[in-house]
A protein has these predicted regions:
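C-terminal and inter-domain tail/linker signature
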Residues: 1-175
């Protein structure tokens, strides 16, 4: 984490731990609001995402750390431009909650949610990672590690099993 307090050997305040986890879960629930279903253009969708309820949870200096192939994004606008916009355009048909992040942990200023599999979706366009759409149903193995600072989510590390997703759309990266 940017403030180097990621490793500690003491018990954290349970109230703070519960609050950080609650903040992460509430933000994640807001992600199921899907402005991409009504957007008329990329710029319209970007504007809708900039004003989406998620904005209330992210720190103004947020950093989103995605896996190789997606990369890192700074600020809500960077996150929208480099991950959310392509992801939402590709996976318009998705369900975060049927499988869900069933592992949930709050520990001081840090929280974790994960599910192996955690998201179901339909691969609907080539906007995310550039592979042609085949309308295949996919499941995603995703973990979210959050660092909370100044009452907001400051950092988010998101390992996504891209090899697993690619194999479900017919791309074998191991050949």
């Amino acid at each position: 984490p940017i403030n180097t307090d990621g490793v500690n050997f003491y018990e954290n305040n349970l109230e703070v731990s519960k609050a950080t986890l609650d903040q992460s879960l509430t933000m994640q629930r807001s992600l199921n609001i899907k402005p991409e279903l009504e957007a008329s253009s990329d710029s319209d969708l970007k504007e809708k995402l900039l004003n989406h309820p998620q904005k209330d949870f992210w720190h103004e200096k947020m950093i989103w750390y995605g896996p190789s192939g997606i990369g890192t994004a700074r600020s809500l606008e960077g996150f929208i431009d480099h991950h959310q916009l392509p992801f939402r355009k590709t996976f318009k048909e998705r369900n975060y909650w049927e499988l869900g992040h069933y592992c949930e942990l709050g520990d001081g200023k840090f929280s974790l949610t994960a599910g192996w599999h955690s998201i179901q979706a339909v691969y609907g366009s080539n906007d995310w990672l550039g592979y042609n759409s085949n309308k295949n149903k996919v499941t995603m193995r995703v973990m979210d590690f959050y660092h909370h600072d100044e009452g907001k989510i400051r950092e988010n590390w998101v390992p996504i099993d891209l090899a697993h997703i690619l194999s479900q759309i017919g791309v074998d990266i191991f050949k």
